[in-house]
Amino acid sequence: EMTSSLVGSEMCIRDRDRQLHIEDYLQMVSAEQKEYAEVSAHQRITENNDIITDFQTDNLMEQILHKDNLNKAYKKVKSNKGAGGVDGMSVDELLGFLKDNQEQLIQQIKDGKYKPNPVRRVEIPKETKGEVRKLGVPTVVDRVFQQAITQVLTPIYEKQFSEDSFGFRPNRGAHDALKQCQTNVNDGYVYVVDMDLEKFFDTVCQSKLIEVLSRTIKDGRVISLIHKYLNAGVISRGMFEKTEVGMPQGGPLSPLLSNIMLNELDKELTRRGHRFVRYADDCMIFCKSRKSAERTLNNIVPYIEGKLFLKVNRTKTCVAHISKVKYLGYSFYRYKGICRFRVHPKSVTKMKNKIRELTDRHNGWGNEYRALKLTQFIRGWVNYFGMADMKGLLQSNDKWLRHRIRAIYWKQWKKPKTKYRKLKELGMNEDFIQWHANMRQGIWNCSNNRLVQFALSNEKLREWGYPTFTEFYLKICEN
């Protein structure tokens, strides 16, 4: 537990340099980007009421640096774990460092002398071949302060955010966004402007963001600290790069800042009377006809580029019928006039690639560990895509998955005498075992043989802990 207050760090405070290291940052990002979605219940204000009267926004720094808020922020960062930043400090080392340096660091923030560390660049491949998503990993100390800022600002801005915005917000998620899409389609809005903002996080105009923040936040110290985080720079391949444009994607603060910036677009769409759904920077505007959608696109682009200084990707932005678009991994179709969901083919491909990775016969995993990893992935995947009509898809997918699992065992048994012994242990008739144990048709073909299927039956694989997509899906349907 922390004592009175907390910390933010400068490299000069540490007694030794730490070597940069590369780690997988995806889990931390996934957890921490959703972190600020734990705040008070959201309320609504009128469109023109930009002044918050029930929050004191001129003394926010004291609220941010209050010991209870900082302790809460520390616990969040601690629970999320995640890789270290440029100073190499791990989450496990954080508490000791904070105890030794908290007073000095807090005083630096109060005096306006605190200088955040640069973020560490991590590149994650996108679905589009050759493209990467650039993440910025803050130091664990900077993550604490970003989390502390987020916890104070979130309830203030929740009162301003649109009901049609769903990304990284309290008690809202992708399923809520999809249900709103469904409602719009059922009301006859079957054409959409599928809006793609080109490299949103990398191209945000910092001065515009600061302008928007300053309308609500009257404590200049908080504005200054946020600006310092935006300008902290990045360490990429050991080299420092300035960050005068854009904001790092990966810390606890970035999801909130992105929603604050794009709330300007939400307000403009609402003012013009459009139906829309936005999840983070994924936005769809709904219209009743193609001509109306084309007109909407032509009219909104000048606002996005001329007023918000963001760039619309004209290659990926399009006007289309709802049945032709992909949104949050789903596709849409209408049955008897009602909008329904499918898993988009690209999402199926991505899922199968992950299954191939988890059932790779050469990864050296133990069978129990593999069954555990498969269970974790399949449960999460089905929970997310459970709104889709996919029973037939999952049944065929389960058949393919079981084939891959049987191939793993057939490879592990290697020698004919081992195969003979294993098949006998599984209760197979000795009259057939000898021939099957000496088959030379290749692992994939042999593992699909009817005797092997009978020996490694669906029930046996389930007994050994291997999951199926269908069983998880049926549980969702029952609930």
Positions of predicted regions on the chain:
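Single conserved hydrophobic/aromatic residue that forms the stacking wall/gate
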Residues: 1-13
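Charged boundary/loop elements
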Residues: 31-33, 37-93, 151-167
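Core structural elements
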Residues: 65, 118-120, 126-128, 368-385
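Conserved polymerase palm-domain catalytic core
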Residues: 108-123, 131, 160-324
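Short, solvent-exposed helix-loop connector elements
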Residues: 134, 242-245, 356-370, 380-393, ...
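A conserved non-catalytic segment of reverse transcriptases
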Residues: 231, 307-372, 376-379
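Short secondary-structure subsegments characteristic of cysteine-rich extracellular domains
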Residues: 388-411
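Extended C-terminal regions of large enzymes
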Residues: 413-479
